Amino acid sequence: ATLKDITRRLKSIKNIQKITKSMKMVAAAKYARAERELKPARVYGTGSLALYEKAEIKGPEDKKKHLIIGVSSDRGLCGAIHSSVAKQMKNDMAALTAAGKEVMIVGIGEKIKSILYRTHSDQFLVSFKDVGRKPPTFGDASVIALELLNSGYEFDEGSIIFNQFKSVISYKTEEKPIFSFSTVVAAENMSIYDDIDADVLQNYQEYNLANIIYYSLKESTTSEQSARMTAMDNASKNASDMIDKLTLTFNRTRQAVITKELIEIISGAAALD
């Protein structure tokens, strides 16, 4: 490569490094807010899931309709955050289909749709976009829950797959159960709550669905921002390594050019003598 080519590459990498450093700073600010909001949001999820655990609610084996919700966002540059959710969804779909279940999927975020739509377009019930641009609110979760309830697909049980935040450098792809109102009512252990009015239980079940979606959105957002922060930090470090190597190559090439020119000058002077 010529000195001009190396200079052009150096300039390009330095510009990219400026972008990755800026993106890391933005992700760090968003991560700090997401982590701060995650702790109170976890109460929504753990409280709602506690009912299913304590009542030991399980989907009946003879029921076939299953729903899988995948949580991602509209933005990338955050490692394997979205592909890990898609992989888990594919594994679940394959297992459930093999067991004779009817499976429909819901994509929260454009990324999950772009990964799965080509191969599973016939199984998409609904998808949601404009996710991840702003911190998710309970209102966003309520809109998604309402859309699912009004979709006309009367699933018996299902699951929501998302990335659960563990630390600033780690997350885990998690799966939590969701159930239809009819499945909850039919559960054996629900008989201990016989004094609960059916309308009250249905309202609570709908509220539960919104709670679990809100909880998963908050977990996913925090995981995404921490992963993006890490990815941009790694990209900046890799850019620094490339800049160092190219600078060394540039200096060696320049030295070789200067040496060659000196030899030519000396040879020319010797020829004149």
Curated annotation (Swiss-Prot):
Pfam families: ATP-synt. It comes from Rattus norvegicus (Rat). One of its GO terms (biological process) is proton motive force-driven ATP synthesis. It is a peripheral membrane protein. This is ATP synthase F(1) complex subunit gamma, mitochondrial. Keywords: Acetylation, ATP synthesis, CF(1), Hydrogen ion transport, Ion transport, Membrane, Mitochondrion, Mitochondrion inner membrane, Phosphoprotein, Transport. The modification N6-acetyllysine is found at K14, K30, K90, K113, K129, K172. The modification Phosphoserine is found at S121.
